[in-house]
Amino acid sequence: MSKLIYIMGPSGSGKDSLMAEARLRLAAEAPVVFAHRYITRPADAGGENHVALSRAEFQLRLSRGLFALSWESHGFAYGIGREIDIWMESGLSVVVNGSRGALSAALQAYPELLPVLIDVPEHILRERLGARGREDAGEIEARLVRARMAVVEAPELVRFDNSGPLAERGQALAGLILETTISGRKS
């Protein structure tokens, strides 16, 4: 049974690494695909593998209804393409890298989605943000404040601790994705 699995969490929580690890650990025959995001950020900016679009390209796609989900965050526009609907109609579960701020809209569009909040203790979040080298100290503090203030509530919300070793946590996420896909249950 196909499901939309909506991964979200604060910057630095390890979503990209965790999703990449889970993707590697899912068997090739598993009926699961990982959607890429369309972002108005250069492709070489670091972080996830995404489709880089100019603002004009993004707006054109948005105006033509080519995004299943879209939102703005940290000065960039993000979109998940309508192709996810085709994938789910064909029986595949789809994993997306979403946004806490866009969860409400995602639930309206896909009421049966499984929301997964990636969580790590603040000291680990601070460490990871510093290690990636994209933000200065002030920007890191601002992200930590946003992470503390963000309240994520949703039916069936799964809080997923990502403070352990990547291989272990990736295997656990792959297990959650596969269990959700096979059972058709939200959690």
Swiss-Prot record:
Pathway annotation: Metabolic intermediate biosynthesis; 5-phospho-alpha-D-ribose 1-diphosphate biosynthesis; 5-phospho-alpha-D-ribose 1-diphosphate from D-ribose 5-phosphate (route II): step 3/3
Record's catalysed reaction(s): alpha-D-ribose 1,5-bisphosphate + ATP = 5-phospho-alpha-D-ribose 1-diphosphate + ADP
Residues reported in the UniProt entry to bind ATP: G9, P10, S11, G12, S13, G14, K15, D16
Source organism superkingdom: Bacteria
Listed GO biological process terms: 5-phosphoribose 1-diphosphate biosynthetic process; organic phosphonate metabolic process
Enzyme Commission numbers on file: 2.7.4.23
NCBIfam families in alphabetical order: phosphon_PhnN, PRK10078.1
Physiological role: Catalyzes the phosphorylation of ribose 1,5-bisphosphate to 5-phospho-D-ribosyl alpha-1-diphosphate (PRPP).
UniProt xrefs under HAMAP family: PhnN
Membership in a protein family: Belongs to the ribose 1,5-bisphosphokinase family.
Name of this protein: Ribose 1,5-bisphosphate phosphokinase PhnN
Organism from which the protein derives: Desulfomicrobium baculatum (strain DSM 4028 / VKM B-1378 / X) (Desulfovibrio baculatus)
